[in-house]
Every structure is written in structure tokens, then in C-alpha cells.
């Protein structure tokens, strides 16, 4: 069909050294190791390491053949992301350079390659040192960049005349009719009798709408209009995706077929302060996401990136995420499209604005981000301002102009921490921390306004902190979300942040982690995570109930008489063992505006004495009721001694490409199967079969849990991960299959 896009991730050679002649064809490769992409230039423990250790220059080399049938075509090498400066060579010749680690780039390598059995060579020098001239660096940055070719690489083979880009935009959605514009950009030689055929295809493969347009002489940009009756729309609660096929045809031959998935929807912020999708108001409830994973930074395969989107949507109950503070993986956004998670995407940066060269790179980053992602229905706003930077009128005026020129369908935002900052963007997006410890945020000072950060550094909380802190942390998140729901002219609010993340020595708790997440760095929930999950609609996402406590004798006075229960049910019943204690309605006194306020039981009124429950080996159960019927339950039991290790993997099968991996969560439980929240015990691992361990060995659990990752080799087979600890009698294991990728 005129277009082949080949995965280029396997069989790379890597060396963590800066070697002068490593781009040359006949360079000695005996000291290189074989790796697959995505790849981190160095792995680390999940905390206590030096950022300087990943700041070095490394080389990647790959030998490859190009089939004879591709002679006469254009060949491009496409990188999704390389931290931070990439210099690319093919067969010893310099091809090009890219600066910036969060946006894609590609080079035309047609003139450098040979065909048939010839072993071509691509060599990439990756400079992951600090670059003060490239965003986000130049001053302190509250996150780590890491290093390597940490995203996918593709080899694209196209006809000489091909489709360079397609821009799909819903201009109007009203009265069950969608008016759509499709702009197709053509590159290469001029053709005769050319046509563009665009088809919008539903999930059943039925063409719902199509249009054919003749290409005029010298025309490089073709704009087509489509009207669709009764389209299935994209919405967070029903994210329908269509397949779009754009064919370039000449002399009855298909020269190119550019395909992608997208949704039919409109987004806008109105002067009443509300956010609207498809003409209906929607309160935005979200968190911020860093792409940092333990051990490898951002260098995780598509499977793990997609899993993060699932966690945000289904385990945290969100309808929106902000990609702080840079564009994130395409696979993450693809999954957000599929599951209906709205995204506020922003350019790389953190507080600092550099010189004119620095600004020019930021402008290029913005262009690359928008051109890459403007067909994603999940994205509802572009972040065109450096996070928390001071005003720069001329710079930000141009950034807004760039965004509006490249995409007329979305508003711009720019995240700041000063209320009197100049508003050049369409929406005033503000990080509001001042009154967080009172459970409050400020009222909007602009018509179009949303809060993009709250909490975070104001009340950092570790998963293994004392019970009182975990409860207070969760309650503050609940109070602030309640406040934003009670402000009708506030579009929404996103807390800081979803997951704990690695940071530089200038920030965090001194161990290279910012404990600002509602989940830990392994994506395991703290109490606050359960609050967010409880806000999801029970009829769409399932009923939920969680007792935010531990069944231990000691208890701090601050929350001593309250048993906090998060639930999206109408009522909650409390039981001691099987004995009914009380049925409670949600607390709409302290939380009048939340969709699903927490439930709070007075333990004295309920006759609950923690010590007596503990001594009598009793249990506490919360049962969630809808329409008077049980739909969910959660039980707390007194904690015993470490009894067993439980291994749980996200995926039972991964691909044998040498990079695919899955998270394995390790939990220590007592005889009742309860996770022991203060059992911070060491666990050792052994791995057998076609797999490798990513993570610490031994790993010290935190709050009774932790995680490692199991990565495939290039051979299909079975992986057995074994775990043991001298605190428990028996070894535990989990099995993961690896499947051939076919080459």
C-alpha cells in the first residue's frame, strides 16, 4: 500500500562510553553489549543514587539490511525520544542532530543506505549530560531526566511522493451532525492525476463517511470537508474511536495510505468558567503524572506506559491527567484515547527560561509536540508555557501564536504559580498551594481558570508513614477536591501528583524521591489514592469501598475517634465480625460538593475499641450499599506475623523482544492474607528461563510491598521469578510466558 513502518527496536549494540570513532563502519564492537529499545543508559536502585551517574555520553550501533524491493523509495529513521542530544550517523556519514529529549525527530537516510544483503550501520551518539542550553535545563529542575534511547525507533519506507501529515479536526458538533476538516500535506515529487481518498471507518470496518479530492498542479496541501450524521462521539465515559484512512492515489495506484485512530468530539472553556466536551459541561478531576519509573526512569516499553494510563483511569478514578512537565510517550496517549482519559499536555521545562537559542528549542519542542499529537482526542489543551516560569511577554505571545496556528481546535494554557501573572493563554492555569493545609484553594481570578497543582510538597507522605499522616494526607486531597467541585466557575483541578518520582538532590526527602504522590513510585496506592477511586461513577466504573485505617492498637489522637471510609456507594454499613454496628450516609457536612463524599464513623458511638478488637482477633467490615443492596465490601483484620510472600504480575505473557517487561508486585501477608503495612523486610529474588530482573536484589519492602520488573530476552519461553525472605518460611514464585515477535 506504499507505506511500511518497521519496528527498529531490537539487536542494538550499546556502550556507556564516549568513543571518538564509534560512528565508523569498521569500529571494534567487541566491548559493546546487545540491547533492545527502549533502553536506559544506566539502571539504578529506586532511591539513593546520584543524578550525575546517568549524565554521560554513550553510543548505540545497529546493523540492518534494506530489502531490494525498497529501491527507489524514501527511507526515514524515526526516533520517538532520546535524552538529550542525539547525533545520528549512517554507514559512517553524519545524518543529523536533535536537541531535546521529549519530542520525536526523523531523518531521511535514503542517500546513505545500500540494499540487498549489504549490512548497513546506524550509529547514534547519545549525550545525556547536563545541557543548560536545552529545555528543561539551565537551572534547578525538580525531576530527573535520565538518559539513553528511551523510546521506540522506527524505520519508515515510503514512496518518493507520500503523505507527510494529516490533521483531523472536528469544526462543529451539533444536532447529531459532525462537520470535519481533514488537511493532508504531501511531500515529494509532483504527480499527475493525483487524488486524496479519505475514509472514516467504524470498529466493524464499515466506511461511515468518505471524500475524494483531486490534487491540483503544484498543490501540497489538500483540505477536505466531511459531514457525518449521528456519529458515535468520544467522551471520557464512552470513548469511541474511528479508524481514519487517507490514501494518496495516482494513475489508479495507491502511493500511500496514512492511517490513524481518532475520536469525534469538541472541547472548549466558556466564559461561565466551565469546561465543555461535546457541548456538555464536565468537571475535570485529575492528577499530574511524571513518566518516571523505578530503576530505569522513562525507559519503559509500550506495555508499561499503557498500564500507567489504566492505573490513572481505573485505579484512581480520574477523568484527566496533566503530563508534567513534558510530552510523554505516544503509547501512553494512545491508551488515553482508548479508555477516555483527558490529557493536558505541556512542553518541557521547569521554572527557568533561557536565552534566545534556548527559547528557539522550546519553540521547536512545541511544534514537534503539537504535530505529533494533534489527532489525539484525549488531548484537550496545550501547555505552551514553561511550568511555573515568570512572565516573558514576547516569548509567550509567540508560543501561543504557534499553538493556534498548528491547531485551531484546542485552547492553550500556561502553568504558573503567581496569581498576577500576565494571561496570554486561553485558560489561566494555576498551581495553588497557599491554603492546602486548611483543605482549601482560592477562587478563580479569570473567567477561564483551572488549578493544575495542589498538595504535593505541602504534605509529602510516604507509603510507610504513620497512620495519622496517611489519613490526613487523604483527607486533605478530599477537602480540596470538594472545594473545587463547589466552585461552579472553576473548570477543574489536578493534584500533585499521581506517583512518587525520582528527583535531584535539591528536592525531595534526601533520598532522590519526591513523596508527593497518592501512589508510591511502584504505582502502589496510599490512602489518598482510594479517595480518588471513590469518586468514579459506580454505575460506569464499579462500586467501591475502602476503610482508610489499619487495625492496630495504637492510634493518634488527631483522628482517634473517626473511622474514615471512602466509597461511591449511597450508604455504608459497618460490622464488627458479623455483628451489625451502624448504617451511615456520606458526610455532606464537611464535603458538601463531592460527587461521593467520604463516610465518617464515630468509633465511640459505634462502640469500637481498637485494643479490644485487636485482643479478640475481631475484624471490621464496611459494606457499600446501592438501592439498599450490597455491592462492595472491605474488611480489616488484626495483623499477625509475616507468613507468606505474594507475587502478582500485571501480565502473564510478554513479547520476546528483549525490552518488553511487566511489573511484579511483592507483598508480605499474615495468616489471614492481610498485607503487613509495617513489615519493611528484605526480599531476595532468583530468575530462571528467558528473562532478566529489573530492580534491586534484595529489595526492601515499603509498607509491606514493593515491585520489580521482569524483562524478556530475545528467545520465547517461560520465566520463573522466585522470591524469598528469612522472615517467612516458604519461597514464592510466579510464571510469565514470553512470545516470539517473529524476527
Swiss-Prot record:
Q: From the UniProt record, list the reaction(s) this protein catalyses.
A: Hydrolysis of terminal non-reducing beta-D-galactose residues in beta-D-galactosides
Lineage top rank: taxon:
Bacteria
Keywords of the record: Glycosidase, Hydrolase
A GO MF label: beta-galactosidase activity
Q: How does it assemble?
A: Homodimer.
Q: What family is reported?
A: Belongs to the glycosyl hydrolase 2 family.
Name by which UniProt lists this protein = Beta-galactosidase
Q: Which organism is it from?
A: Thermoanaerobacter pseudethanolicus (strain ATCC 33223 / 39E) (Clostridium thermohydrosulfuricum)
Query: What is the name of the gene encoding this protein?
Result: lacZ
